[in-house]
C-alpha cells in the first residue's frame, strides 16, 4: 500500500478538513505532517460546526487511527482546549489519536516572541497568526527546541527553563511593549502537558513503516496551502514549514517511493488571509459577495479573508511542484449568481505575457490577464449528481481540467460532508 497525500493548492483555507472527513472512511490512518495550531480545519455535519487546529480531521470516524506527525508543532494549551471541546461528542481520542515523540512543542515564550517580532516589523508585518509557529520552527532548525518525547524525561522542567531563559533574553532585546504574566502562562502550560502525557506517544516513522508493510491505507493531511510553503510560496509572506508534497516525507518519516495519489484541493475562486501578494484580489462588489456568501473569515484568527478570481497561473505552479494526480474543487456553490466568471490564465510581467509564476508577484509587478466564462444562477446545495449540475458549471470544470491537465474528481457544493459530488 502507499501513502496518499491531501494538499491545499492555494494560500490555505481550501477546505481540507471537510474533504479529509469525507475521504476518511476509505483509509485506516490519517496523519498530519506539518504546521501547527495556525491551521483551522473546519468540518460540518449533523448541523454542528467543528474546527480542528492540531488534531487530524479523521478523528470523528471511530475506525480510523489519527497521527500527529513529527513535522507538526504542538501547543499543549491549544491541544488541551481541543480535547475539552471534543469531550461532549464521545470521540474515542485515547484509542484513536497517536502523537509523534519527535513533534516539537510550542512554549508560551514562543508565542510571546512571535508577538514581539510581528509588532517590531511595523508596516512590514507578514500577517502572523501569533501562535508561536515561526519561533518554534526556528528553535527546531537551530537545534534548541523541546519535543513531545522530552515530557517523558525526568529533567523536562530543567530543559524547559533553560530554553525559556534564552527566550526572555531575546524578548528584552525587542523595542516593543508586550504585556504578559509568564507565571500564569506557565501554570496553564504545565497543566496542559499533563493532558498530553495521557495520550499514546509513538515513534511515528516506525509505526507508519510497519503499517505500510501490513497493507494499511494511509492518508497524509497537509495544513495551510502550497503557496505558503517556506521554499516555494510567496516568500516572506509564507508559513514556516513545507506545505508541498515533499513535506509529507520529512514530516512523517515515509520514503518518497511510498507516496501514491497526490490529491490537490482548491477553491473555485481564490482567497488569502493576512499580508502578501494576491494578483487577482477583488475590491469590488464581486469580492464582497465571495466574502459574505463563502463565509470567508479565518477559522483560527477570525480575520476576514481577501477574495479574488481563480488564479490558474499560481494553481498550475502548485500542481507542478507537488506532482498532483487528481483535484478537488471546493465552494462551487459560492459562485452561483454571477453572470460572468473570470479566470486568470496568464500575467503581464515586465511588458511580456507569461504563464508561469515569476520570482516576484507583487501587485506592482504583475497584471492578471483574464479569460471570461459564463456564470450560473442555480442553487447547487441540494444537488447530489454531477449530471444535474448546470452546464455553465460543468463547462467551468472542463475548462480548468484542460488548462491544468489534471482530472477534477470531486466538486463540493456546500460545507456539509453530504454536499460533495464525486465524478
What is the predicted role of each segment?
Residues 1-423:
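Non-transmembrane, aqueous-exposed alpha-helical and coiled segments at domain scale
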Amino acid at each position: 500500500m502507499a501513502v496518499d497525500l491531501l494538499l491545499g493548492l492555494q494560500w490555505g483555507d481550501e477546505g481540507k478538513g471537510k474533504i479529509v472527513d469525507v475521504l476518511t472512511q476509505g483509509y485506516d490512518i490519517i496523519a498530519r505532517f506539518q504546521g501547527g495550531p495556525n491551521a483551522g480545519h473546519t468540518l460540518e455535519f449533523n448541523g454542528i460546526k467543528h474546527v480542528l487546529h492540531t488534531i487530524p480531521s479523521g478523528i470523528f470516524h471511530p475506525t480510523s487511527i489519527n497521527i500527529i506527525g513529527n513535522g507538526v508543532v504542538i501547543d499543549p494549551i491549544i491541544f488541551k482546549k481541543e480535547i475539552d471541546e471534543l469531550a461532549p461528542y464521545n470521540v474515542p481520542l485515547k484509542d484513536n489519536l497517536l502523537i509523534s515523540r519527535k513533534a516539537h512543542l510550542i512554549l508560551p515564550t514562543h508565542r510571546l516572541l512571535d508577538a514581539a517580532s510581528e509588532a517590531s516589523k511595523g508596516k512590514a508585518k507578514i500577517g502572523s497568526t501569533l501562535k508561536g509557529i515561526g519561533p518554534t520552527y526556528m528553535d527546531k532548525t537551530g537545534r534548541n527546541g523541546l519535543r513531545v518525547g522530552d515530557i517523558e524525561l525526568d529533567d523536562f522542567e530543567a530543559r524547559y527553563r533553560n530554553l525559556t531563559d534564552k527566550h526572555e533574553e531575546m524578548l528584552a532585546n525587542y523595542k516593543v511593549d508586550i504585556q504578559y504574566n509568564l507565571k500564569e502562562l506557565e501554570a496553564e502550560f504545565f497543566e496542559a502537558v499533563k493532558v498530553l502525557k495521557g495520550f499514546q506517544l509513538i515513534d511515528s516513522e516506525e509505526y507508519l513503516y510497519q503499517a505500510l508493510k501490513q497493507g494499511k491505507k494511509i492518508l497524509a493531511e497537509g495544513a495551510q496551502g502550497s503557496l505558503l510553503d517556506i521554499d516555494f510560496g510567496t516568500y516572506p509572506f509564507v508559513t514556516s514549514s513545507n506545505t508541498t508534497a515533499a513535506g509529507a516525507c520529512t514530516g512523517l518519516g515515509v520514503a518518497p517511493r511510498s507516496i501514491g495519489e497526490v490529491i490537490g484541493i482548491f477553491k473555485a475562486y481564490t482567497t488569502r488571509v493576512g499580508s502578501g501578494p494576491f494578483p487577482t484580489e477583488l475590491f469590488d462588489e464581486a469580492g464582497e459577495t465571495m466574502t459574505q456568501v463563502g463565509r470567508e473569515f479565518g477559522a483560527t484568527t477570525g480575520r476576514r479573508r481577501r477574495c479574488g478570481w481563480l488564479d490558474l497561473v499560481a494553481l498550475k505552479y502548485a500542481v507542478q511542484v507537488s506532482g498532483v494526480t487528481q483535484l478537488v474543487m471546493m465552494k462551487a456553490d459560492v459562485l452561483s449568481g454571477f453572470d460572468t466568471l473570470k479566470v486568470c490564465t496568464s500575467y503581464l510581467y515586465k511588458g511580456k505575457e507569461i504563464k508561469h509564476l515569476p520570482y516576484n508577484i507583487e501587485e506592482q509587478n504583475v497584471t492578471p490577464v483574464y479569460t471570461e466564462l459564463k456564470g450560473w444562477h442555480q442553487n447547487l446545495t441540494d444537488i447530489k449528481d454531477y449530471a444535474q449540475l448546470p452546464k455553465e458549471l460543468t463547462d467551468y470544470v472542463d475548462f480548468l481540467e484542460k488548462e491544468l491537465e489534471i482530472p477534477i474528481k470531486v466538486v463540493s457544493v456546500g460545507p456539509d460532508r453530504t454536499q460533495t459530488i464525486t465524478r
